[in-house]
Amino acid sequence: MPREIITCQVGQCGNQIGMEFWKQLCMEHGINPEGILEDFAVNGEDRKDVFFYQADDEHYVPRAVLIDLEPRVINCIQKSTYSSLYNPENIYIAKHGGGAGNNWGRGYTDAEKVQDEILEMIDREADGSDSLEGFVLTHSIAGGTGSGFGSYLLERINDHYPKKLIQTYSVFPIENDVVVQPYNCLLSIKRLTLNADCVVVLDNNALTSIAVDRLKILQPTFSQINSIVSTVMAASTTTLRYPGYMNNDMVGLIASLVPTPRCHFLMTGYTPLSLDQKYTSVRKTTFLDVMRRLLQTKNIMVTGAVKKGAYMSILNVIQGDVDPTQVHKSLQRIKERKLANFIPWGPASIQVALAKKSPYIDSGHKVSGLMLANHTGIRSIFKVLYDQYRTFRKRDAYMNIFKQTKIFEDNLDEFDSSDEVVKNLIDEYAAAEKMDYINWGNDDDDMQFDPREPPKFSNIQ
């Protein structure tokens, strides 16, 4: 039985990448922009109902809730060729339409005011599921809506559905994208640490570099960057939608990648990559070639993260024409050449999931691969944002903007709490590189979490 997943798209960025994700899923499942299954896809062996349900007229509708505090992006979606794909009852645009002004506090406060309306949408989707497995959140952590509203929504979903999994696709900012983004990011990372089970980190700097260096796009647009993100999102859900023997549900995916509860931030790599399949560069894509390329720094979608540190886990989702006998040989070659450095206290192995390709898309290459990896070097992106926050906080820079919102009008305790959680997260990823990690934090009575605490998903039946 398929285990359904509800997607929540929050803010400008969250809805933009969500839109591209649904376009990609429609193509891969043979669903047209109106939600009608094409004749050639009627007898498919895929699991469309993980992410879609069928309306009374049998057209497919995404299990999605679209949320924004300003109307521009959702209006564009509603005017696009995919306008009739979504359930209009699951779209929320704030009546004031003014956005959150890049202020986490405003986004968080606005979410609190309308929580009943949003939770009603989510409950309705959950009630329409036979076996709900979890939630996916798409958002950015730099601005106001994706960060603040997204943070509040994470907390409420976690409270409301304590045994359901929560995975996020979180876009981390380009430098100086928003002047107060160090504050917004710190406050968001606290919620991602305490309320999500798995966070796929999408680094805008790395995505832009990949578009420029690998795809030869001099000035990549938001649409082109979002297309890269949608490719990663679709590939990461392939085993759920085209199930095989392993990793065919959310629990299986996350359990294989998250060895300890708080270290659940993943980086990705994808190869071969192109925005237009007609112009895919001609190359030989063997299983070994794809596996090696996925470990190359230039293909990692978090800037500089793998230059130092060690892998805690790797799952490669390989699609295409693969001879299963080549899997062991290729893994042995990678091990012999020491292409991946693993932590000393865990299994030093790359997990491989062989997944089916959509029969409805001609990709232009025989084999493609997605790497989902838990690497201690991910702390570098947290450290940059944390240091920026500390610099701002020492000067109380722009703090008056936040003091005007309800959550900060009496005190700044929320900043202090977030500071501690993020610092502990950075410290834990550093500690995970050492053999004595299992004893880390035992002597610190003030620790907010225990690295040996069982993950939520270990208790799900």
UniProtKB/Swiss-Prot annotation:
GO terms for cellular component: centrosome; cytoplasm; gamma-tubulin complex; microtubule. It comes from the Eukaryota. One of its GO terms (biological process) is cytoplasmic microtubule organization. GO terms for molecular function: GTP binding. GTP binds at residues 142-148. SUPFAM superfamilies: Tubulin C-terminal domain-like, Tubulin nucleotide-binding domain-like. Pfam families: Tubulin, Tubulin_C. The keyword GTP-binding applies. Belongs to the tubulin family. Tubulin is the major constituent of microtubules. The gamma chain is found at microtubule organizing centers (MTOC) such as the spindle poles or the centrosome, suggesting that it is involved in the minus-end nucleation of microtubule assembly. This is Tubulin gamma chain.
